[in-house]
């Protein structure tokens, strides 16, 4: 049986645990606490560039399909904003300096896989990323600016939805669009399940960054200890 459904509510309720787990990854907790390492952050932006490029390419590919069309909003696209940030953090030749991390490769491979086999599952990834960006974007922007002493919007274009004037209203309309998609019960369950996978894929990226951040601190401490053992060193 195919019918209109409260997909937005089912996605929210069905991902509550995964959402909470993602927020409790050490990297995310540190970020929310105002501890932001520039090297780790710019790798995060690079990772997101590859993820959003995959999502947006595949969404565009299916934009006229009956299932994808209701939630295809170009004003949500993050790729160009991420390119702006990447130029800020890496310089004009940023394309030669960035690469997807191992966890990011798994993520983008998943996007391309479901686009080929079950494109309706792209809904889950759009829900997970875009609604999250709209909901917490301004808070994360302020944290990023404060932690890295940024001003004038430099390095935080990712959080700006310039073509969306009223984010609260847009989110409400997006949820209504989700609810308008004609889906079977089994399709809804698959989409909710895929949304949980999306959260886990994001967690893997955050965990990877946390591990790299710890390595950076360890190297810094090791070098500092070596320095204080050198003859003539003064603290």
From Swiss-Prot:
It is an enzyme of class 1 (oxidoreductase). Heme b binds at residue 19. The keyword Iron applies. GO terms for cellular component: chloroplast. Belongs to the heme oxygenase family. Pfam families: Heme_oxygenase. Its EC number is 1.14.14.18. This is Heme oxygenase. Catalyzes the opening of the heme ring with the release of iron. Key enzyme in the synthesis of the chromophoric part of the photosynthetic antennae. GO terms for biological process: heme catabolic process; heme oxidation; photosynthesis; response to oxidative stress. It catalyses: heme b + 3 reduced [NADPH--hemoprotein reductase] + 3 O2 = biliverdin IXalpha + CO + Fe(2+) + 3 oxidized [NADPH--hemoprotein reductase] + 3 H2O + H(+). It is found in: Plastid, Chloroplast. It comes from Rhodella violacea. Its main location: plastid.
């Amino acid at each position: 049986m195919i019918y209109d459904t409260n997909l937005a509510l089912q996605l929210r309720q069905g991902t509550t645990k995964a959402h909470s787990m993602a927020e409790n990854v050490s990297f995310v907790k540190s970020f929310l606490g105002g501890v932001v390492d520039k090297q780790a952050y710019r790798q995060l932006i690079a990772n997101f560039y590859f993820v959003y490029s995959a999502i947006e390419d595949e969404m565009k590919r299916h934009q006229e399909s009956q299932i994808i069309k209701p939630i295809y909003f170009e004003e949500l696209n993050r790729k160009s904003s991420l390119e702006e940030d990447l130029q800020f953090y890496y310089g004009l030749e940023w394309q030669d300096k960035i690469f997807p991390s191992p966890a990011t490769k798994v993520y983008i491979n998943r996007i391309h896989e479901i686009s080929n086999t079950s494109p309706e599952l792209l809904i889950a990834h759009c829900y997970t990323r875009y609604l999250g960006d709209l909901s917490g974007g301004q808070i994360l922007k302020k944290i990023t600016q404060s932690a890295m002493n940024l001003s004038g919007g430099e390095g935080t274009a990712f959080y700006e939805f310039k073509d969306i004037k009223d984010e609260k209203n847009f989110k409400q309309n997006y949820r209504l669009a989700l609810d308008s998609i004609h889906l079977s019960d089994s399709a809804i369950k698959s989409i909710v399940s895929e949304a949980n996978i999306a959260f886990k894929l994001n967690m893997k990226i955050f965990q990877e960054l946390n591990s790299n951040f710890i390595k950076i601190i360890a190297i810094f401490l090791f070098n500092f200890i070596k320095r204080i053992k050198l003859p003539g060193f003064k603290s």
